[in-house]
């Protein structure tokens, strides 16, 4: 017999029992997609060993959902091959909103989707068991996939010592490291979304492929809800709203590098000004480091060796330079300009740095995926004993910042990867436990992702939920044990000796451009007043009312209210519609009555009308709404 632990409960099982056997013993096998066995993702068919710790994964767990979607990608490939046997499957990963599979030697359109979906439904209903097999060596794997040059290329690139596995469901076998569902049966709802062209390995010089995107769910109800969400997302698309509201544009001369218009810069500046006030109150100092630094710096940081293909480089006066893809190395140099003592710690250094990273053109998308963006980084230097308290301070800052925008979020703690890490076991354990204790004290929901940390330390990722329940990974808190050593950073400890500081690297917005894109979609372009590019628009009924309109505009402008005047020849109703289409928060109409009484006729963008409001009363209400960073209108 063997003894295993699941949910802090001990179980006794016979030798050779699998995770599925344990699930059956718990009478819950129908719920589970896979399992974390000793923090490693595994199939339910995995044989358990004495002393194992098991955590089952369901559709509601991110990792369980990933297993479900990965199996769905295999079902897609199997369905396509049944209908087009000469097609060549290449890769089929899980992505944020579902999955895709790339095929060579295939020409289809969306008109073929019903046939593929029907075949996928049949495959699910056939309830094929899904089994894993391991090839004895690389040669055996190459021999099996000899008719598929794409799979063969992937196999050839694997190190000799790597275990090469494949998964079988019915007549279909695919190269894959898994894990997968125990059968095709749980995939009850399957929908294809679109096709696009792609290149093998994202390289335009390689073979052209067709990419098929899809989603799947355990129930038809969940699929319908998701499709409704996709329709709502189209209405909120920041690329469409960004153009309609005159916030930003994209130009062919600079793909992935957005042009921000005056209205967009108003929103941008409101975000940045808020960020600066928040960080000043929290004890951060702000710096600015150069965008262009020489090769020597990037060699010290490790970027030149490991990240060069994503960097923009140039040679000036026979010296190699790179435009910074990250702010961290510049902050390391700033730290070294002075001597430091433990008495200064935590030392909080913040920078909104302009960074550039080369992304493939096919990956670019509005403000969400760009080649240049501003990252709101901060680097906090501290002693090991301060990690927990300072992490909690940052988590409190996270709570305040996202709460200001009305955004819900959850946290994800990623722990030490199996291989390739730096730092001692003791330091990793100390750091991970400190982050976890801070998360518990923050009283915010969090999940643990075993082995998903960076090579230089554990991290906490912040996943934001928007108005239509999509999640976006924005901020991060990373404990870095790497860069302080690479740059030989020192401080004088309490014993008067030189020590290397621990560093917390954190970003709250992440990319300001991306965060702005998220806000556009979250608010559907209807920004709260303090973020709005235009607070008030004054609309004249006739030419004789323009002088009063300009007088009011000057009055409001001097108070810090963003105001414009529409004295065009359009009808009043058309002017109001124009203002509402541009999501102006408040409209003031000036006619003969308002000219005589000096009172205001105010209309909101939701068409609420308020008459006979005194100028000073309106000013006071608007200024208070701005000051309080209110998310709801005061009138």
UniProtKB/Swiss-Prot annotation:
GO molecular function, one term: ATP binding
Region Catalytic, annotated ranges: 237-528
GO BP terms, alphabetized: threonyl-tRNA aminoacylation
CC cofactor: Zn(2+)
NCBIfam families for the chain: thrS (TIGR00418)
Known function: Catalyzes the attachment of threonine to tRNA(Thr) in a two-step reaction: L-threonine is first activated by ATP to form Thr-AMP and then transferred to the acceptor end of tRNA(Thr). Also edits incorrectly charged L-seryl-tRNA(Thr).
Name of protein: Threonine--tRNA ligase
Organism of derivation: Chlamydia trachomatis serovar D (strain ATCC VR-885 / DSM 19411 / UW-3/Cx)
